[in-house]
Amino acid sequence: MSNTNYPRQLQQLGLNIARYRKLCGLTQEELAALISMSRTHLSNLEAPGQITSISLEKLFTIADVLNVSPASLLSFD
């Protein structure tokens, strides 16, 4: 687990990525290849029990590939 002040937000980010990935019909392996990330790292990012951070640039890349706004991935309602 990462040492962070924002565990809830990072967990929700991962869940949002997983939701939009599935809506696009992509597997973790496919998305990981498209964003130049290992499948293991993506899996950790999406896992509800994991707290994994990513760079802002990577967030923009994921949003672009999933055809959503970065704000959609950062929606914590």
Regions found by a protein language model. Name each.
Residues 36-52:
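Recognition helix of helix-turn-helix/homeodomain-like DNA-binding domains
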Residues 17, 31-32, 42-45, 73:
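Conserved hydrophobic/aromatic packing and binding residues within compact polymer-binding modules
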Residues 15-34:
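Short basic helix-loop element that most often maps to the first helix and adjoining turn
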Residues 49-64:
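Short, basic-rich loop-to-helix N-cap that marks the start of a DNA-contacting helix
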